[in-house]
UniProtKB/Swiss-Prot annotation:
Catalytic activity: a 2-demethylmenaquinol + S-adenosyl-L-methionine = a menaquinol + S-adenosyl-L-homocysteine + H(+); a 2-methoxy-6-(all-trans-polyprenyl)benzene-1,4-diol + S-adenosyl-L-methionine = a 5-methoxy-2-methyl-3-(all-trans-polyprenyl)benzene-1,4-diol + S-adenosyl-L-homocysteine + H(+)
InterPro entries for this protein: SAM-dependent_MTases_sf (IPR029063), UbiE/COQ5_MeTrFase (IPR004033), UbiE/COQ5_MeTrFase_CS (IPR023576)
Domain of life: Bacteria
Originating organism: Rhodopseudomonas palustris (strain TIE-1)
Protein name, UniProt field: Ubiquinone/menaquinone biosynthesis C-methyltransferase UbiE
GO molecular function, one term: demethylmenaquinone methyltransferase activity
Pfam families, per the entry: Ubie_methyltran
Length: 253
């Protein structure tokens, strides 16, 4: 329940807490059709390598052992498609996203890849998932949790829907930790990325928000503490590309 006057950040702006989700939805409605292309352009294709590390860490069964993945904020299906290709006959993924435009792109791509029998798409909110307790073997969220207004609620929901012995994986932008790289990274982020967004999608403002939202996301050790508060054990993280991204991991034991 939102308290009157309660605020949160939308990029560098303070906004009423109950308005952030609408603002985030507007961002992804605007960019859905070019979202994956923009990921390639913004990261120089590196996001593919980061996601491959996530799937390798997930390590889904390659035989017919049943394995249910919940891919939250999975929109266009990229993580689920990668997981499906790395899995055996028992794999099934549910992509849960609050944005209908992103989901529609994902459904179309699942059909194109002949993966619509292994990956389904449902509209839902990370803060109040519609799934039963202890119903999934793994939970993934890639470059999505920083857009959730109440991250603590999303983490508690992730814990709730996971079976005991199952893993939570979160791939998210982080804090550059290589001397000299941070200034170049800031220049690219604040000057180049919004301009790429303007040229490719006609929307520089959405990418300005995305850059700002990265800077507002908690440091890895703070996010690990939030995971522990939600109940996760063995919370840790793996930094990649000089700190540009981190893969966060935790277990429901």
């Amino acid at each position: 329940m939102t308290e009157p006057g309660e605020t949160t950040h939308f990029g560098y702006r303070d906004v009423p807490l109950d308005e952030k989700q609408t603002l985030v939805n507007d961002v992804f409605h605007s960019v859905a059709g070019r979202y994956d292309l923009m990921n390639d352009l913004m990261s120089g294709g590196m996001h593919r390598l980061w996601k491959d590390v996530m799937i390798t860490t997930l390590n889904p069964p390659r035989d017919d052992t049943p394995f249910r993945l919940l891919d939250v904020a999975g929109g266009t299906g990229d993580i689920s498609f990668r997981a499906a290709k790395a899995s055996g006959a028992g794999f099934h993924s549910t992509v849960c996203d609050i944005n209908t435009d992103m989901l529609e792109v994902g459904r179309q791509r699942a059909v194109e890849r002949n993966l619509d029998d292994k990956v389904d798409f449902v509209e839902g909110n990370a803060e109040s998932l519609q799934f039963d307790d202890r119903s999934f073997d793994a939970y993934t969220i890639a470059f999505g949790i920083r857009n959730v207004p109440r991250i603590d609620l999303a983490l508690k929901e992730a814990y709730r829907v996971l079976k005991p012995g199952s893993r939570f994986l979160c791939l998210e932008f982080s804090s550059v930790d290589v001397p000299g790289l941070s200034k170049l990274y800031d220049l690219f982020s604040f000057k180049v990325i919004p301009e790429i967004g303007r040229v490719v999608t006609g929307d520089a403002d959405s990418y300005q928000y995305l850059v700002e939202s990265i800077r507002k996301f908690p440091k890895p050790y703070d996010f690990a503490e939030m995971m522990r508060d939600a109940g996760f054990a063995r919370a840790n993280w793996q930094v990649m590309s000089g700190g540009i991204v981190a893969l966060h991991s935790g277990w429901r034991l």
